[in-house]
Design a protein with these regions (language model features):
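Residues immediately within or flanking Cys/His clusters that coordinate Zn2+
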Residues: 2-3, 17, 59-62, 70, ...
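Short cysteine-rich clusters marking metal-coordination/redox-active sites
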Residues: 6-9, 20-23, 62-65, 86-89
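Cys/His-rich microdomains that often coordinate metals
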Residues: 10-13, 27, 69-72, 77, ...
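Short Cys/His-rich micro-motifs in 6-15 aa windows
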Residues: 24-34, 88-98
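A short Gly-Trp-Pro
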Residues: 27, 32-68, 157-161
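Short linker/helix segments within small regulatory modules
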Residues: 56-59, 76-82
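Fold-level signature of zinc-dependent metallopeptidase catalytic domains
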Residues: 84, 94-95, 99-110
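Auxiliary, metal-adjacent structural segments of Zn-dependent hydrolase domains
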Residues: 109-161
Length: 161
């Protein structure tokens, strides 16, 4: 995995960082630039999604993926995009029940691994269509628990693969 650098102060950054430990700048991952980037808030009014200028790509405006609200994603989406979710989170079909204690922590670990997978898929320019884009061959993630009912009603045990 590539190491990154804060565009504001030069501090070493890691893929999952959301804040620079040196200068305090908010950070986000910009898939199109393959960069963790320092962000400058645009000062949106309350109730609207916060928009940012990415120091790695200052001409465009960005916002965080909707899953950033749960502290499980640091990827950016163009502010004018109709998608609420980033390229990686668009593939989530089922997420854990967040009302169950501990599920948010488990989901975060799974999301970090999934985001590393998508980093690699994008880097290698491999196809990664969603099930909505391609119902037959698209990719979808169902993050299930053996303790919760199966969301598709099949009653089959939870398995990986």
């Amino acid at each position: 995995m590539k190491l990154f650098e804060c565009q504001n102060c030069g501090q070493l950054l890691y893929f999952e960082n959301t804040k620079c430990e040196s200068c305090g700048m908010r950070l986000g991952y910009l898939p199109a630039r393959e960069a963790v980037t320092a962000l400058k808030a645009l000062g949106d009014p309350p109730g609207r999604p916060q928009r940012f200028r990415a120091m790695a790509e200052p001409r465009a405006q960005y916002r965080f993926c909707a899953n950033a609200e749960h502290n499980v994603c640091n990827w950016l989406v163009r502010a004018d995009s109709p998608n609420l979710f980033c390229e990686a989170c668009q593939h989530n079909r089922t997420i854990p029940d967040l009302s169950i204690a501990g599920n948010r922590i488990h989901w975060r670990k799974i999301e970090f691994a999934k985001h590393r997978l998508f980093y690699t898929l994008l880097k290698l320019r491999l196809p990664h269509k969603t099930k909505l884009d391609d119902p037959q061959d698209g990719l979808a993630f169902d993050f299930l628990s053996a303790d919760a009912p199966h969301p598709h009603g099949s009653g089959t045990p939870v398995m990986t693969g």
